[in-house]
């Protein structure tokens, strides 16, 4: 009787286990049918049930020989539910246990799709490339298109064009157009571009065409922008975006034309985010050319206006605050304010680091060296100048000799003594006090703490 009872329990457990595996497979097939029929919500529910059934089987029968297959079903279901962060490692682990070639192809396609969703486009292209010869016609055709698309997105334009050869997918002309432009085959790209423009197609991947082609022939792409902004269906935001990106590309070749393009972008869609970014870009160009306190004042006025403009708010506020600090420090140094050397050095650092204005930073560092040569921070300014532009400090060896006793010069030779820490602590405390004062916050003096010289940006001769 007892033996019979044990046998019955074992048999019942085996049935439950077998039913779990069977149901996971049945639900997988149901999910696939629902997807083919376009019942996406129902399919997603089936995939979720696959995960539940698979988890149950794995938890109750971890040593079963069927577990690898169930893990594969679970991994694929996770991918179909777009839980790609979990699906990718699960698929990579489970694919070797896929029951047949069709399952391997389906799982590999899902792996590629998830890699693309996670932004690993190069790996996605490689995975799609493994299933472009799949037996299932629907999967094969989609894999071939996605393979071309992933190659194009990863910048492998020549490979994308090779992969697209002899394919007839209606989505491919847009991919070819971008790939041809990116490969520098502009005349061939223009054949497809002309067709899309003639049909006033604003859904074509124009941003990608302009970006890829702009790296090869910025003038040809600039001429294309003129045609695109004339499309009847182009929205103000589209026009501003195309003009903005064109202006930024042109700045490297023709700053006058680039600035004119940015002005067009600002006017094309005044209330749009790209227009705000264009106005900010123009202000940043003026900021980069600033050399005096008066120059900064004019740009700060523009930046203050941009604080409330979409597309410019955060950066405009940061730049306005930094430029104001630089201007105030430069003016106070000119007026002979106490500790003007520290203020001038910090202003130069702000111009260099926060404003990305190396020319203005160089002017301020040199002012410190020339106007206050006895400052303990003059040697640090010399090193910063040399770091910015070695050719611009022809007297660098003589200056190093003049400041041979400076802790900063000693640090160049690896001699970090207490004098350097004291100077750096003093500079950091002054920076904190000045920053709090500009915000209206009182700062209580604190005892100096030992500070490693690397806590501020290191300055070393090149």
Regions of interest found by a model, annotated:
Residues 1-5:
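Bacterial N-terminal signal peptides that target proteins for export
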Residues 9-462:
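Acidic, polar-rich low-complexity tracts and alpha-helical solenoid repeat scaffolds
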């Amino acid at each position: 009787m007892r033996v019979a009872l044990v046998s019955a329990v074992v048999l019942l457990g085996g049935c439950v286990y077998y039913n779990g595996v069977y149901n996971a497979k049945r639900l997988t097939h149901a999910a696939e049918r629902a997807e083919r029929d376009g019942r996406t919500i129902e399919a997603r529910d089936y995939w979720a049930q696959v995960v539940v059934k698979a988890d149950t089987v794995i938890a109750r029968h971890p040593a079963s020989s069927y577990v690898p297959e169930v893990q594969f079903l679970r991994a694929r279901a996770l991918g179909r539910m777009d839980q790609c962060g979990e699906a990718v490692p699960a698929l990579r682990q489970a694919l070797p246990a896929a029951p047949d070639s069709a399952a391997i192809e389906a799982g590999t396609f899902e792996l590629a799709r998830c890699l693309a969703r996670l932004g690993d486009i190069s790996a996605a292209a490689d995975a799609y490339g493994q299933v472009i010869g799949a037996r299932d016609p629907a999967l094969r055709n989609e894999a071939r298109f996605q393979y071309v698309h992933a190659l194009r997105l990863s910048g492998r334009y020549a490979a994308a064009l090779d992969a697209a050869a002899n394919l007839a997918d209606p989505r491919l002309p847009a991919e070819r157009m971008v790939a041809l432009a990116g490969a520098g085959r502009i005349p061939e790209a223009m054949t497809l571009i002309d067709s899309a423009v003639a049909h006033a197609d604003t859904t074509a991947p124009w941003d990608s065409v302009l970006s890829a082609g702009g790296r090869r022939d910025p003038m040809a792409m600039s001429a294309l922008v003129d045609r695109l902004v004339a499309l009847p269906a182009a929205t103000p935001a589209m026009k501003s975006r195309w003009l903005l990106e064109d202006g930024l590309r042109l700045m490297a070749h023709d700053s006058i034309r680039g600035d004119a393009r940015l002005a067009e972008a600002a006017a094309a869609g005044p209330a749009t985010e790209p227009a705000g970014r264009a106005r900010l870009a123009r202000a940043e160009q003026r900021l980069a050319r600033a050399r005096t306190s008066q120059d900064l004042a004019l740009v700060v006025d523009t930046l203050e206006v941009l604080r409330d403009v979409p597309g410019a708010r955060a950066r405009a506020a940061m730049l306005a605050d930094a430029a104001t600090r630089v201007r105030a420090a430069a003016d106070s140094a000119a007026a002979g304010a106490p500790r003007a050397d520290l203020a001038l050095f910090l202003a130069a650092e702000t111009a260099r680091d926060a404003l990305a204005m190396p020319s203005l930073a160089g002017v301020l560092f040199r002012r410190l060296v020339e106007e206050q040569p006895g400052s303990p921070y003059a040697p640090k300014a010399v090193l910063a100048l040399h770091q910015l532009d070695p050719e611009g400090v022809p007297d660098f060896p003589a200056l190093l000799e003049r400041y041979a006793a400076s802790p900063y010069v000693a640090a160049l030779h690896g001699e970090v003594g207490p004098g350097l820490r004291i100077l750096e602590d003093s500079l950091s405390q002054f920076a904190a006090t000045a920053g709090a004062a500009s915000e209206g916050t009182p700062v209580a003096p604190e005892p100096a703490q030992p500070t490693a010289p690397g806590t501020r940006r290191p300055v070393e001769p090149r």
